[in-house]
Structures are given as structure tokens and as C-alpha cells.
A protein has these predicted regions:
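A conserved short beta-strand
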Residues: 122-141
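Alpha/beta-hydrolase fold catalytic core
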Residues: 1-33, 54-57, 97, 156-158, ...
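Short glycine-rich catalytic loops that host catalytic nucleophiles or stabilize transition states
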Residues: 324-330
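Hydrolases whose catalytic domains are alpha/beta-hydrolase-1, hotdog thioesterase
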Residues: 112-116
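Active-site loop/oxyanion-hole signature of alpha/beta-hydrolase fold enzymes
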Residues: 15-16, 61-104, 108, 118-119, ...
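Conserved HGGG/HGGXW glycine-rich cap/lid loop of the alpha/beta-hydrolase fold
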Residues: 21-77
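Alpha/beta-hydrolase
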Residues: 147-307
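Catalytic histidine-centered segment of alpha/beta-hydrolase-like enzymes
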Residues: 291-299, 330-339
């Protein structure tokens, strides 16, 4: 049975929005750092990174709405990632943590902490974006400026999740018989395929993903038909709609004041968030995996990394401090498959 590393505690916190399960580590009077996980993940994914932290930091890693052991309240997709950002703020209030905090966000969590900074720039000491979702959300944008491919953002949202994968999540499939079993999806995309995780830890992380709220209010969310390729457009409920470019746009971070320093860490082999993402409809259409693709001029792959870089360049031009670090041989979770390198970058940045 998998055990948490020494010094990490599991706690439940009642906030004025929902009950949140968290992992916490470090002295209560230490420098506060909040770690926000990504889609189809939980706080447990952070445990080894938390265990590597210097002793002066107080780390809080919540299970976000829709995932883990946090109360499974609905996700309002029309708010983008603001539900998650507001939940973090409510958690900090409940923990009586005041003042500016360091925010670390992985994938979807990166978008959530950018939204947090837009809404509360004075409350952020720094932002660390780890393989972050693009500031223009996930799917259905065509260029570095986030221009939508169609007016209804077809090809993003709750309707683009693979149905076999969704069913296996719903069935709590912890095996490895199918490429779409959650375990195999994690092995292929969450960390580098060459990385071999301890079996007990892998079992624990699979079990965490299987706690996800699989529904229209959680993952994947609802959807509506579209006259545009590939025939579905985002709905208004659930996490994939919150991530759709229709509802998620945190490019306004370039205008915040004050501007906290930003560290962007990414794996060079990320297949989830990239300019040729394995989950992007444009990229899949280009490969012939989805029929009737209308071509690059109509529906190109979303340039996710280029979009993030362009926004951070504008942030820097406006007076902000930014830094991009690429970890070679890493995938979507560099703090998993390259723990030492990622921890060194993060904790050096946090000081």
C-alpha cells in the first residue's frame, strides 16, 4: 500500500464554497506555496515534489473541484477556470493565509492560477506554470493570437473526449487491457514513456484519477452539435468546457499590475500541451485520425506552446519578469519523470 512521504499530511478543509481535500507540508508560518494540479489528477501527483521542498516553505496542494476527495460540486464551464481560481481563494481564506502567495499550476492548473492572478494581482507573489494549458484554452484556436477556428469553437469542450476512455473512467477501470485504459493513458501521456514508476505509486495515482467526477458537471462535461467540423461544440458544464477557448481566455494576464515573476517549465516531449498535441482536433485531423478534416487553412493544429510564449513575451514587454525552462527527455509531468531537475528549477525560483 502506498504511503505519503514523511512530512506530508492529508487534511479536509471546509471553505465557504466547498469542502476541499488537501495535502499540506512544511511549517504553518512558512512561506505559502499553493500547488494546483491539472485535469484528471489530484493533489497526490505533487507528493514527491512537495517532499523535495526546502524547510522554509508551507505547501498546500488541494484536490480541485471535480477531482479527488474534494466535494464534487459542479463546474460552471461558462466561467472558464474561474471556479478553480475562486476555490483556491476560498481555501486560503479558510486556512487564514493572507498576503501574497506563490502559485504553482500544472496543465489546467496553470490556466487557473493565471486567472487567479488576473482577478487578484496583489495576492500573488509568483507564478510557476508547468506544462500549462495555453492562455487561449484548449482547442479550436488557430494562431498565436488565439483566433477561433469557428464562431462556436467547434472541436473543443466536452464532446471531444474519447468515448471509450470516458467509459473506462466511469467503470473505474484500473487495468491495462486497452490503450484507452486510464493506466495506459497515464503511462503514455502524463509522464515520459521511458519513465518507470514504482508500481505502488502508479497504482495509487490510477486510483486517484478514478475518483474523478465523471459526468456533465465534471469530466468531460456536456456538448452541443455543430455545423462545423468535427460536428461538436462546447457546452456550458464541466471541465473540458471550462478549458475550451470559448470560455477560457487568460491572455489578459498581460495587463495586470503588479506583475509577479513568472517561471514557465515544460517538458520537450509533452504530447498533451504542444503545437501538435495528441488531443487537439486539428492535429488529429491532420494525421487522418479524424475523418473529413477541412485542412490547415480552415482548422490547423492549435499552436499551444507558441501561444503561451507570445503571451509571456507581451507580459515581459509590459514590465514583467518571465523565464522559460525546457526539460529535455520529459513529457507532460516533468515533476514526475524528472523530479530532481524540476524541483531544482522551482525551488531556486521561489528562493
Amino acid at each position: 500500500m502506498y504511503r505519503l512521504p514523511d512530512g506530508i499530511q492529508s487534511v479536509d478543509v471546509d471553505t465557504d464554497r466547498l469542502r476541499m481535500h488537501c495535502l499540506v507540508a512544511g511549517p504553518a508560518d512558512g512561506t505559502p506555496v499553493v500547488l494546483v494540479h491539472g485535469n484528471l489528477a489530484t493533489s497526490l501527483f505533487w507528493d514527491e515534489l512537495m517532499a523535495a521542498a526546502p524547510p522554509q516553505l508551507h505547501l498546500v496542494a488541494p484536490d480541485m473541484r471535480g477531482f479527488g476527495d474534494t466535494e464534487p460540486k459542479p463546474i460552471d464551464g461558462t466561467r472558464g477556470l474561474r471556479d478553480w481560481a475562486d476555490d483556491v481563494h476560498a481555501l486560503l481564506r479558510a486556512l487564514q493565509i493572507s498576503g501574497a502567495v506563490h502559485l504553482v499550476g500544472w496543465s489546467t492548473g496553470g490556466g487557473a492560477i493565471m486567472q487567479y492572478a488576473i482577478d487578484r494581482p496583489d495576492a500573488v507573489a509568483s507564478l510557476t506554470l508547468i506544462d500549462t494549458v495555453s492562455p487561449y484554452g484548449f482547442g479550436a484556436t488557430s494562431d498565436v493570437d488565439g483566433t477561433p477556428t469557428t464562431a462556436d469553437y467547434a472541436g473543443s469542450g466536452g464532446g471531444v473526449a474519447n468515448p471509450e476512455f470516458v467509459q473506462r473512467l466511469r467503470d473505474r477501470d484500473d487495468g491495462s487491457e486497452s490503450d484507452f485504459s486510464p493506466r495506459n493513458v497515464m503511462r503514455a501521456f502524463y509522464w515520459h514513456p521511458d519513465y518507470r514508476m514504482d508500481a505502488e505509486r502508479e497504482d495509487a495515482l490510477v486510483a486517484e484519477v478514478l475518483k474523478s467526477n465523471i459526468s456533465d458537471d465534471g469530466y468531460p462535461g456536456d456538448h452541443v452539435p455543430s455545423q462545423h467540423w468535427p460536428g461538436v461544440a462546447p457546452g456550458e458544464r464541466g471541465i473540458l468546457n471550462a478549458l475550451s477557448g470559448r470560455w477560457c481566455n487568460v491572455s489578459g494576464i498581460v495587463d495586470i499590475s503588479p506583475k509577479p515573476p513568472v517561471l514557465w517549465i515544460r517538458g520537450d516531449g509533452d504530447l498533451v500541451v504542444g503545437d501538435q498535441s495528441s488531443f487537439d482536433m486539428g492535429a488529429l485531423g491532420q494525421l487522418g485520425a479524424i475523418p473529413d478534416w477541412p485542412g490547415d487553412e480552415v482548422y490547423p493544429p492549435q499552436p499551444m506552446v507558441a501561444q503561451t510564449r507570445a503571451v509571456l513575451e507581451r507580459y515581459a514587454a509590459g514590465g514583467g519578469e518571465t523565464r522559460e525552462e525546457v526539460i529535455a527527455g520529459s513529457s507532460h509531468g516533468p515533476f514526475i519523470d524528472h523530479l530532481d531537475a524540476c524541483a531544482a528549477l522551482l525551488y531556486d525560483f521561489l528562493g
